[in-house]
Design a protein with these regions (language model features):
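C-terminal transmembrane bundle of multi-pass solute transporters/carriers
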Residues: 63, 74, 80, 87, ...
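Juxtamembrane intracellular "pre-TM" segments in multi-pass secondary transporters
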Residues: 1-13, 195-226
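Transmembrane alpha-helix termini and helix-breaking/packing motifs in multi-pass membrane transporters
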Residues: 35-41, 96, 100, 157-177, ...
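Substrate-agnostic recognition of the 12-TM MFS/MFS-like secondary transporter fold
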Residues: 14-32, 54-72, 76-92, 108-167, ...
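Helix-loop junctions on the cytosolic side of multi-pass membrane transporters
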Residues: 133, 181-203
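A single, central transmembrane helix in multi-pass transporters
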Residues: 17, 21, 25, 29-33, ...
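Extracellular/periplasmic helix-loop-helix junction of adjacent transmembrane segments
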Residues: 33-59
Length: 344
């Protein structure tokens, strides 16, 4: 047990962890609410349109992240994170207000989703590079795994709670809760003590995107791991779309059952994260996890009813998150501090 939660003995990381848990809860509830808003309320079952909303949100990650990673190597990572979170909180507040006032339209969701994705593209590499500053190097694999445990612990509760709240109080109020969670996370970032960070010396030359590409080219192992992460992130993590369509159109279920699918996936994801926190990252774990993920996804596509599909979500969650955590830890512990931010 001490091994699993070793990084929580570091005060700065403990503050950060509590904030991410709060933010992740809000995000998972909001993702459930936004998917329901687009698929059921605004488009009356148009899954393709929901896919486009997700694509608009994800596109900045592909385009901007390499340059954002180089920026994170030169500037205060915490400042970038706080700024990005403020922008995302404003986006969430605007969308919540539009829904609660009844004037929301699909094009508005597209614009807000794009802005949110752009802010996330700056936040992601900054937080990847910030985590190594929160803990001693020996605790880094554990810290990365606990970050995933926070994310997937929120996945365990967030979607199910979000689905129930949609039925009880409506989509707009679920999004309003997300705004409160953003404010809480921003507050915890500001509480982290700068004099207790494990900062590394400045790089000998400015971090540039081409430096990161050149570094990765010299490391075939990183090419494999980053390719796995890219392929899964691009093609394998469309659960907000597939789960919503399967729950509502294939099985005729409501918002509660849709949210439950995310929570069941969270059970497997949480088990994967806690398991990764205890063991050393090895390539064989990536191979095993990919096999479990592939088989369970294939069986999910053939599921004859909601119950079977729901049970398989736990195996999908374990396989997907085990793959990504192990690959992530292997990357973070095998690169120099100045390349962490632009190899993600």
């Amino acid at each position: 047990m001490r091994t699993i939660f070793a990084s929580l003995t570091v005060p700065n990381y403990r503050i950060y962890f509590s904030g991410t848990l709060m933010a992740n809860m809000g995000q998972w509830m909001a993702r459930t609410a936004q998917s329901w808003l687009v698929l059921i309320i605004l488009t009356h079952g148009n899954a393709a349109m929901l896919g486009w909303v997700m694509a608009v949100n994800f596109a900045p990650l592909l385009v901007v992240t390499p340059w954002a990673g180089a920026l994170a190597d030169r500037m205060s990572k915490r400042r970038i994170m706080v700024t990005a979170q403020i922008v995302m909180a404003i986006d969430a507040a605007i969308l919540s207000t539009l829904v609660l006032t009844g004037i929301v339209q699909l094009w508005m969701v597209f614009v807000i989703s794009a802005m949110d994705g752009l802010a996330g593209a700056f936040y992601s590499p900054a937080t990847q590079a910030f985590v190594p500053e929160l803990v001693p190097l020996k605790n880094l694999p554990n810290a990365v795994s606990l970050n995933s445990a926070s994310f997937n612990g929120a996945r365990l509760l967030g979607p199910g709670l979000g689905g129930l709240l949609i039925a009880a109080v409506g989509v707009g109020w679920v999004m309003a809760i997300n705004v409160v969670c953003f404010i809480g996370f921003i507050s915890t970032l500001l509480l982290i003590k700068a004099d207790r960070l494990y900062t590394s010396p400045p790089a000998s030359e400015k971090a540039r995107v081409r430096d990161g590409i050149r570094y990765v080219k010299r490391r075939p192992d990183l090419v494999i791991l980053l390719t796995i992460g890219f392929m899964m992130g691009t093609f394998g993590f469309n659960f907000n779309i597939s789960d919503a369509v399967m729950a509502t159109q294939a099985f005729g279920k409501g918002s509660g059952e849709y949210g439950l699918l995310g929570s069941l996936m969270g059970i497997g994801s949480m088990a994967a994260a806690l398991g990764a926190a205890r063991r050393k990252p090895r390539l064989r774990w990536v191979e095993l996890a990919l096999l479990v993920y592939t088989i369970s996804m294939g069986l999910s596509a053939l599921a004859p009813n909601y119950g079977t599909f729901a049970v398989l979500k736990m195996f999908v969650g374990w396989g997907a998150i085990s793959t990504l955590i192990t690959a992530n830890v292997m990357v973070q512990t095998s690169v120099t501090p100045h390349t962490v931010s632009y190899t993600h």
